[in-house]
Amino acid sequence: MDLSIVVPLYNEAESLPELKAWIDASLKDFTYELIFVDDGSTDGSWDVIQGIAGPSVHGIRFRRNYGKSAALYEGFAAAKGDIVVTMDADLQDSPEEIPEMVRMIREEGYDLVSGWKQHRKDNALTKNLPSKLYNWTARKVTGIRLHDMNCGLKAYRQEVVKNIEVYSEMHRYIPYLAKNAGFDKIGEKPVHHQKRKFGVSKFGMNRFVNGFLDLMSLWFLSRFGGKPMHFFGTSGILMFLVGFVMTVWIIAAKLYHQANGLKFRAVTDQPLFYLALLAVVLGVMLFLAGFLGEMVSSSATERNNYQIKERI
């Protein structure tokens, strides 16, 4: 099979029949399967999926809303195509872009091709500006030169999606996850962005803020997640040494003054003593945090455990 088209969705009942027809018209030269992942919709989206289901159209229905990362995780697990394509269900992504993205993977050797919405059909202040700021930061932190890291329209070699774990809100950073897994040939294609035809956008400032927090978390985990002691232990030792050096200096100064008959304030009357004590205590706490992190890391249970109500 050439392609698996994975479409995560939440309350997009009105757009689904038109989206399927658009995909069918755009991919006549390919063999493909269409996988709708209903993330706990309450507007009858599942009924629509059942109505359009067929030999090449499948559906996965969650018992409740878990988020886009969960939907992509289950969609990736179910995908059988040589190339896996993700797109949103709101008709703002154009399936007509998919053949060129597939060509880039097949002929130019890319592991992943991400869409770039150069001319967004969104509110400039509430969505476009935050998106530009977010993507600029993501480029600086990840080192991946993509203009639109969070674009829903992406194409992957199958081995990419089978070797990454998408959890929490990490769907925004799949290119970074892929890069860390060794799939570092990442391309970009400008794509047309359509105005939303049905429903309302799920984007809000809370998602914008969470995106930055997730980026920092991913950066940290990619470097120290497997060995938390490397970070906490090193920080703890450095902090302990700072406190130890300050303590030695205080004691040496006291002994010097006593040996020369000079007055010297009591150790506990000196602010430096309390700074030294604080540094030593923090150092010990950070070191212990490293041990706890190692224990949690070695005994962590599977993160992606979602309750699926139905499959078709």
Language model segments and positions:
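Donor nucleotide-sugar binding loop of glycosyltransferases
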Residues: 12-15, 41, 68, 94
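Short, well-formed alpha-helical segments that are part of the catalytic scaffolds
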Residues: 12-26
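A conserved acidic beta->alpha catalytic loop
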Residues: 38-47, 91-92
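Hydrophobic helical membrane-anchoring modules
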Residues: 176-312
